[in-house]
Amino acid sequence: MTTLLIYQDTVVLDRGLHRRLKLKPQDNARFAAATHAVPLVAVEFSEAAREYPIVFARGAAEGDKHGELLCYALTGTCEGENLYLDAAGRWNADYIPAFIRRYPFVFAQTGADQLTVCIDETYPGFDDNSGEPLFDEAGEPAALLRSALELLTDFQRQAQLTGAFLKKLDAADILMEAQMRADFPDGRHALVQGLLVVDEAKMKHLSSATVQEWLASGELGLIYAHLLSLGNLSRLAQRMPGSAVTPAPEAPSATTMKKRKGKGAT
């Protein structure tokens, strides 16, 4: 979960250089307009599953090893598309993932165990003259920055816990490749490949000990939240441009998930 995605020009937040910097929150999320998949942490699954398809994918492979397993809320049907923004650039969903909410702040790893707070200088809400200050008169973090640090710290901790869950999920070998296809009456279609989803048939072969362990830890609930969230794929397709004005009898066909056996996506 180290990808920056929505961040354009990150710099270390310096109490000397940025002593007078203020932030005026913007009422839009245009910074995420080109993000078709938003990283999630496991604690978000129950909320996110109500509105987003939760899917898995692999990061870049290292040598002959599979890439790290990651989890995302799917927000578009192709790269560079976010269907959860309205015409004014506002996030159009009840639940906004923490990855989005923490912007324009982010932790950057500057050492083996050292994290440094950074900001995206391109964020239009930063200003020296108006907004809430990041630092107080003594140069200490002001209320806004303290709140941002709390969110960053919690997200980092949850990301580590999520990583441990994903390693278990990967080792259990219960994932399969899948692709999402939405067909429209005018001949258009959307196809998303490289996704991984849990194979319910494979879950039946898990040992009783594993099932009991995952039940006790809450990880089994995460898997079922993921499976239930796949019902949002059709709702995602209906957010595509033009679908809202299509007459009801000719609405896009239900999004289908075509599944292929296999442990990793390409």
Labelled PLM ranges:
Residues 1-75:
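Short, extreme N-terminal leader segments that mark the start of a protein/domain
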Residues 9, 33, 54, 58, ...:
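Intrinsically disordered, low-complexity regions enriched in small/polar residues
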Residues 30-34, 78-89, 158-164:
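Short, basic/low-complexity N-terminal boundary segments at the transition from targeting/disordered tails
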Residues 42-46, 96-98, 170-174:
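Short linear motifs in intrinsically disordered
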Residues 46, 92, 195:
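Short, glycine/acidic-rich beta->alpha junctions
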Residues 49-51, 95, 101-102, 177:
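Short beta-strand-initiation
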Residues 57, 70-135:
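Aromatic- and glycine-enriched beta-alpha-beta binding-site module
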Residues 106-266:
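A contiguous, surface-oriented mixed alpha/beta subdomain in the mid-to-C-terminal portion of proteins
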